[in-house]
């Protein structure tokens, strides 16, 4: 799958929103009962580009057209969220996939990953090896010594750049020409969760 353009860089601040879906029932007594409907968050990303050259806006425009607006998904790597020292941040309990009893190689939801811990149904798994940049879109991969059993939930903790399967939030994209050969635009992305 294609990867969102790494250049031009968006301006700061940019926004990443994590959303869960919780069903809350309130009783006559005021007591509440909550039920989690989404095990993992659905994320959205808002990017601003305040000063773009004609070639930079064309890069974004061409990518948007190739994705047919909101129709086709793509990979987005969050290479912009860093710690105070400028290093990639830690991510906890990120979805990798589900075992099928035969697959041993899975893409990690990140690249340039380190400090990785794999989990099968919440229990850490030591029998794994990692490969850097060999997955779809340049993601890192994990190989299990033996295939996770059918239905096993595979998650990971890691430090690195988070990879998200996204789509454009809207079927329209505007570009504002605010000076000779200078443009600005904003882009909103929504995570496309697996079925």
Cite the ranges covered by each PLM segment.
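Polar, enzyme-active/binding microenvironments
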Residues: 3-15, 119-156
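Intrinsically disordered/low-complexity terminal segments and short unstructured peptides
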Residues: 6, 17, 21, 25, ...
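Residue-level detector of short, conserved catalytic/binding motifs and their immediate flanks
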Residues: 45, 116, 152
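Extended beta-strand solenoid/passenger and fiber regions
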Residues: 61-132, 148, 158-195
